[in-house]
Amino acid sequence: MLNPKLKEQNMQRLAVYREGLKAMPQIHNLFFELTLRCNERCLHCGSSCGDVPSDEMTTEQWCGIIDQLKEDLGTEGSMLCITGGEPLLRTDFFEIMGHANELGFNWGMTSNGTLITEEVAQKLRDCGMKTISISLDGMQETHDAFRRTPGGWERGLQGVKNLVKVGGFQSIQVTTVVTHQNIVELDALFDVLKDIDIDSWRVINMDPIGRAKEHPELLLTKEDYKTLFEYIRNKRIAGEPVCYGCSHYLGMEYEREVRDWYFLCTAGLYTASIMVNGDITACLDIERRPEFIQGNVLNEHFKDVWENKFQIFRKDLSLENEKCRNCKEAKYCHGDAYHTWDFDNNCPQVCFKDVLFD
């Protein structure tokens, strides 16, 4: 384990930094939810995407928003993070993102990879995409069943290979959602990925949000979590580019061991999202309730909403719950991630205190 004293000092500094962000938030990651349509039907999808009605803004509306962001905020220091659904299902995708590129925005995307032919990969590079994360959730049979998409694994993997072949991107990442079912396939999937020149493998656990609430049997057990974090730590010790995602406070044992820095939920602090219909919120994984919608870009400037609202996201959740208030880790955890907080009962749905540490 890394030096515990140094870890604690760094976590204390991060807590001070978080307090500063609450007072003076700085937008770094702005998500564009271009569509809720998707050609896959993932059992864990936080947004319940698929063959669903998608009240999408038009090409002109998205381009107008990009113009407004350029005028109000500039392009330095922020990243447009494009997501869905599957963003590439929009026939105007390259028109919208080409416009963002022309104005000087840095942008990246999450995708299932199934639509990324070599030609599409070239177009993504040519219109300025910097980073991309492709989902591969286990080996072929498991992935296709989990995403309810026959052939999805093969097409997604080929999408990764096409991106690597074309090249010219800052980062090509594969993301794997780990479940009780596919955790046994991590080694096999690693063997597949190590022969492809990707930049990183991001491994995250399935959270009880969206459709995942209907499949509790897929959530990781206490033993699964320990297996997962030991697996990631050992890979990182061996110099492999594997990391755990940003969600959840992991305690002294695993913080900074399984990812590049310490836990900080940035929702509303330096992360915000523009939803498919123009609504403004913090993180797209947060439950879609009226009180979390801070405004709409069709009738308000994003900058005004960001600077004058978002108070619901700029507080310490650990103060809302007795268990958290009495926890010695609260000063670093702050109630954990907003997207797994139970706002009806004022308690975290995911807490690793009883799983990883006392």
Predicted regions and their residues:
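Structural motif corresponding to alpha-helix initiation and N-cap regions
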Residues: 59, 90, 117-118, 183-186, ...
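Flexible mid-to-C-terminal extensions adjoining Fe-S/redox cofactors in radical SAM and related proteins
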Residues: 2-28, 48, 279, 285-358
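Radical SAM enzyme [4Fe-4S]-AdoMet core and its adjacent flexible, acidic
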Residues: 2-6, 54, 126-281, 285-297
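Residues immediately within or flanking Cys/His clusters that coordinate Zn2+
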Residues: 31, 35, 39, 262, ...
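Conserved alpha-helical substructure of the radical SAM core
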Residues: 2-131, 220-221
